[in-house]
Amino acid sequence: MKAYDFTQGNVLKQLVLFSMPIMLGNALQVSFQFIDSLWIGNLLGAKALGAAAVSSTIVLTVLSFILGLNNATLTILSQQKGKDDIKGMASYINAFVVLLTGLSIGFGAAGFFLSELLLRLLKTPESMIPLAETYLQIQFIGILFLFGYNFISTVLRALGDSKTPLRFIAFAVVLNTVLAPLFISVFRMGIAGAAYSTILSQGIAFLYGLFYVIKHKLVPFSIPRMPKWEESALILKLGIPAGLQMMVITGGMMAIMSVVNSYGDHVVSGFGAVQRLDSIITLPAMAAGTAVNSMAGQNIGIGNEKRVGTIARLGVIAVISCMLVIAVMIWVFGKYLIRLFISEPDAVAFGEQYLKWIAFFYPFIGVNFVLNGIVRAAGAMLQVLVLNLISFWVLRYPFTALFSAWLGQKGIGLGIGMSFLFSSCAAFLYYRYGRWKAMKLFTEK
């Protein structure tokens, strides 16, 4: 597969061609979770689905920290790729492998033995705990596969290859789609079968990916050895704030749910439906953010500030154009999209109302993803953490509470939409006037 050298060539063409496989990969990740829920809900019932959902929340919280380390991977390796420092790339990849293996063992063991305690801390209904504990313990047994599966994709994207990871993700989705009903119903393993199907699919995809990249020499892997202290320190320096960003987002959404929950079942159901749509609507923006991170990282690595500016400018134009088209589609077809998930009239009415309020604010969240991706490429992870704190806790939650208190349930969409607008303004101000351009991850020898 082709790996892009983002330090030369047509920026817009590279942005589109590189981000499309990332968007498809993210869509497949969403479908992985959707298909899993579909089989569990239909074959095992609502209680099993609830148990799996609670367990998945815990696993995703742990994964969010690891995704932070993956963002550090993307930034560090993109800059090394830009400098064409193969030895440096190999050394940092080794450090990531050692850290991820250690964290996998630590998180896996702790999660396995603390599963019941974690579920009780989340106030899981007593009737669900046995099912949830079974599902969660199996997930923690296979957490190395989950980490590794995401890690290989991130490394390849950092090196300019977004197509090869799509192969592994698609393989895992197809495998899970086949294995889940087989393990649940044919082998009569129940919810344990669903969990084993997930980790087996991810495990085989991880091993397939590892074999593929080694065979085709796509990544400079080596026999693992103890990394240098400065390498581990840099990874953690960037990775911990990036991991906390994900937790800030999760916590912010939980706070917003407290506002939504106060309006009754029909609003909660309608909001749940629009959140499912939201995970699809924002796929292009997320893909653009990941793409510009890799593209800008390579150019920051060689000090090409002018091209970084071009990437930012064209990235913003492209994402606004794309999200405006999506906004029009949401405005016109929102009611029908909501009905894919729910049929209760009051819930559908709220969902349609929400989408009409928020539709034309979506381009601003695209701007946010792109500009944060640019500054993240320079290693400004702590600064992006602060921007996310502003976005979710200074803007989104207060605006949602304020506008809903003023306008009732229709104020929820307006409040969240206004937070998109002001968050993008904050991101632009830091991009324009912040000191991220002066950051240096590596000292010249």
UniProtKB/Swiss-Prot annotation:
Biological process per Gene Ontology, one example term: monoatomic ion transport
Positions of transmembrane segments: 15-35, 49-69, 95-115, 136-156, 168-188, 194-214, 240-260, 277-297, 314-334, 355-375, 384-404, 411-431
Q: Which GO terms describe its cellular component?
A: plasma membrane
Which InterPro entries does the UniProt record give? MATE_fam, MdtK-like, Membrane_Transporter-Flippase
Superkingdom of this entry's organism? Bacteria
Q: Which UniProt keywords apply?
A: Antiport, Cell membrane, Ion transport, Membrane, Transmembrane, Transmembrane helix, Transport
Chief subcellular location: membrane
What's a Gene Ontology MF term here?
xenobiotic transmembrane transporter activity
What is the topology of this protein in the membrane according to its UniProt annotation?
Multi-pass membrane protein
Localisation per UniProt entry: Cell membrane
The family note in this entry says: Belongs to the multi antimicrobial extrusion (MATE) (TC 2.A.66.1) family.
State the protein's name: Probable multidrug resistance protein YpnP
Organism lineage: Bacteria, Bacillati, Bacillota, Bacilli, Bacillales
